[in-house]
C-alpha cells in the first residue's frame, strides 16, 4: 500500500499593494473572487482561515516598543492564513490560483516548523557561527 503522507501546514503571508492602475471595481471583483476561492479551499481541506491585519501595530524589541508598521514599507503585510499541502511546491501551486495576485498582491509561503526552537540546530533564527 502506497499511502500519501499527511499534509504539512504552511503559513501564507499576504504582502504588497494593489496596482495603482487598477480601478476600485477591478480590485473589488478580485477581492470577491478571492473569498469564493478561499472558502472553496477551506471547504476542501486545503486551507485554514487566518485574518486580515489592522493597519496599526507596534514593534517590540529589547530596545523597547515603538509605533509601526509603517505604510511606506515596500511590501506591507496585509494578512495571513494557512495552507495544507504535501510539499512547498504544492502549496505554491495552490496559492498561484489566488485572484488577488493579478492586481499586485504577493503571497509568501513558509513551512511551519513543528519543533521547539534550539540554539544548536540550524534554523531561520539561528545565530551565525562564530
Tell what function each PLM region has:
Residues 1-130:
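Conserved, structured core segments of small domains
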Amino acid at each position: 500500500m502506497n499511502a500519501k503522507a499527511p499534509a504539512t501546514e504552511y503559513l501564507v503571508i499576504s504582502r504588497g499593494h494593489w496596482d495603482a492602475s487598477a480601478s476600485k471595481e477591478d480590485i473589488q471583483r478580485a477581492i470577491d473572487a478571492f473569498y469564493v476561492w478561499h472558502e472553496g479551499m477551506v471547504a476542501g481541506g486545503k486551507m485554514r482561515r487566518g485574518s486580515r491585519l489592522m493597519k496599526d501595530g507596534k514593534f517590540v524589541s529589547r530596545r523597547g516598543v515603538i509605533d509601526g508598521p509603517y505604510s511606506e514599507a515596500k511590501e506591507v503585510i496585509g494578512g495571513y492564513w494557512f495552507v495544507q499541502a504535501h510539499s512547498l511546491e504544492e502549496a505554491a501551486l495552490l496559492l498561484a490560483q489566488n485572484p488577488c495576485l493579478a492586481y499586485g498582491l504577493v503571497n509568501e509561503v513558509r513551512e511551519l516548523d513543528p519543533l521547539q526552537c534550539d540554539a544548536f540546530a540550524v534554523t531561520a533564527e539561528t545565530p551565525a557561527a562564530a
